[in-house]
Amino acid sequence: MPQPLAQDQSRTLRSPQDLARAGLVAVDAVPGLEAVAARYATAITPAMAALINKDDPADPIGLQYIPDVAELITAPHELEDPTADAPFTPVKGVVHRYPDRALLKPLLACPVYCRFCFRREKVGPDGGLLTEAELQEAFAWFEANAAIREVILTGGDPLMLSARRLGEILGRLAGMAHIESLRIHTRVPVADPARITAALVAAVRQAKPVFIAVHANHAREFTPDAAGALARLADAGLPLLGQSVLLRGVNDDASAMEALLRAMLRNRIKPYYLHSLDAAPGTARFQVPEADGLALVAALRGRLPGHALPLFVCETPMGGGKKPVA
């Protein structure tokens, strides 16, 4: 059977009580946060908890991970499935929205749970792990669809799988003649860098190109431990791409965004996408108007080289996929 957690996660903060004991929320806030926890998962790894300034309620790391009762308020425009994955799911765990590529979601567990996640109604510590039969059905779908050139592993976070299981999945996909490349979307290198072991790196390396899309939203996430994890991936010849979400109070000014993108470059990450926030339930506090995002991107053009500028994108309605914000 697949094993989602290859290493000890016991020190991860997973409840309002854990957060209060760590000094990240007030004790009297716990009852209100219990209602949030009943709906949306919480997890803050030791690596991320250590970065949070407990004396600053607007700390950009804390904002990303500490739950807030505002999450229980759903705005009229917010959707449970804002990217419309469900209509494009031919078999469990697969999302096929573009002609030449498709997603594979082998599990729904993450090292941390972002408060703005567009899959927040689905992800959680139970893992949502595909059974062996479901995984074989997904493989059969990929084998039967020769137009697919790239498989994108997401979730959840694929690097939460054991090295053995991850290697098995990647190897099976890489063995399909029509698949030219693989991509893994992950927060693990910054959120839980100790997981990037030599065994995991060896499992990720395949006979076909494997791109690692690293999700990070603030320069402070690039700790020395994160830098070491990213170096282990880059030194193995794995191309690193950067993905971020434009978030109010986290990275929505030019200085913060410039620092983030420069941190990516220092760690051999090519900035790839800057996402406008998907309208998942209870995420309105993070929303940045697209006009403000465009102004931010314009301001960065005079401050950074072209290869440091990500493409600013948004999701189109009804599962139409990403498009540049214009």
Name the predicted role of every residue range.
Residues 1-96:
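Flexible, acidic/Gly-rich N-terminal and inter-domain linker regions that tether
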Residues 61, 65, 83, 196, ...:
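Short clusters of hydrophobic/aromatic residues that line enzyme substrate/ligand-binding pockets
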Residues 96-133, 184:
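Canonical Radical SAM [4Fe-4S] cluster-binding loop centered on the CxxxCxxC motif
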Residues 136-150, 159-304:
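Conserved AdoMet/S-adenosylmethionine-binding subsite of the radical SAM
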Residues 152-154:
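Eukaryotic intrinsically disordered, low-complexity regions
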